[in-house]
Amino acid sequence: MADYIEINSERLCDCKKGYLSCVEAREWMKNQIGVWNFNYEPRDVRDKTVHPAVFPIGLATRVIEQFTHKGELVLDPFCGSGTTLVAAQDLERNCIGIDLKQEYVDLSNSRVDNEKNGNPCKQIAVCRDARTLSEV
């Protein structure tokens, strides 16, 4: 196991410096109010026997879009089934997922491998304890 993970975190977008994300201000404000509704899509893991805490890709997508720019790094310290990694890949964000169980790390990495779409960003899950982030 490597001592460190090398992964880029530089912006790939042309957004103005100081902007929180690539989302336009009006859209960003609209997303701060009310209740978010999401429909499941075929790529979503819905089976609670696969992982007890599954959620739609759309939820991870919304949060990542709201708070990051293309090319930046997303950290999921409890990656489970890898939904955040899939959303990060869709949005051209780098992502590191961490989980205690190797079976979930394998599931996460296989979902990302299955979703390759040619973007320049990297998504990877590792089997570690999130309490030791400085060692990742």
Region spans (language model):
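Class I S-adenosyl-L-methionine-dependent methyltransferase catalytic core
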Residues: 1-136
